Amino acid sequence: LPGLEPDWTRIWTYKEAMVPPSLPTSLLVIGSGAIGIEFASFYRALGVAVTVVEVQNRILPVEDEEISKLAHKAFAKQGITIHTGATVKQLSHTQDGGVMARLRTANGNTAEIAVDRVIMAVGITGNVEQLGLEQHGVTVDKGHIVVDEWCRTGATGVYAIGDVVGPPWLAHKAMQEGVLCVEKIAGLEGVHPLDPRSVPGCTYCTPQIASLGLTEAVAREAGYELKVGRYPYSANGKAIALGETDGLIKTIFDAKTGALLGAHMIGAEVTELIQGFAIGKTLETTEAELMATIFPHPTLSEMMHESVLDAFGRALHI
């Protein structure tokens, strides 16, 4: 961002934030996507005073709005200061070795925040500049290489995977792209293209956040008639035994077909739980099959079952 370039000593990218020479006493995180929230949660757990600034009207803007609101509440309870609808207009070095940030707040006012360090967490892009890609028939659009469902570029024999082809910027998505790309080149039978709607996204903060498929808002905008189920951690025996009663499992179904459109979670170990719904969505499992599936007791996974049941008015334990 113009005027907000990292200097790698006081104003960090995610790389410097991974290996700080010393622990700052205060930190400003610009951006509240997965990277920003993970660092905010991590540094707050170490006792750092953390402030998060997000230009959108809520943190974790790509997540389901209900999950985003619960996350905001949880982080605020931990002592993280959050400014949404705000923009960082200027960063300047201070004589004490810190940084002064000038913000435009949601109500249009100007505010200043003095911190030890700043993390720029406004997103990542692959390195595609000045490689001469266009000269060889590879199309680059808005910083990303354009590929088809098999990761083929516009140049014969040239494939691209991972961050350079655009979101979601996830290691497991890039790995699967690499596998299907090589299998397609090798001529293996039964190779399936990657469906981005079946790629689980995980944010490793406290509480954890995980999601899959469409959010409720996006599904409604797409014209689906929905069945939405919810189940709280506070009603699950395993969560109570673990002392982890803050959280929610939310499932979204097509009311006409019973297809699982999305699953959204916040709470302990949801980054492990989400894979169950990823398998179900990949196999095109319906609500009837999920409701008929036996989930072991006592486990956190029972909340997944209860959320599905709740979507169709059949929840058992709430």
Label each residue range with its predicted role.
Residues D7-P24, E112-E189:
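FAD-site-proximal beta/loop scaffold in flavoenzymes
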Residues T13, L46-E149, L214, E221:
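A Rossmann-like FAD-binding core segment of flavoenzymes
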Residues E63-L70, A74, I161-E221, H297-I318:
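A conserved FAD-binding loop/helix module that cradles the flavin
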Residues V199, C205-I318:
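Flexible, glycine-rich terminal cap/loop adjacent to redox cofactors
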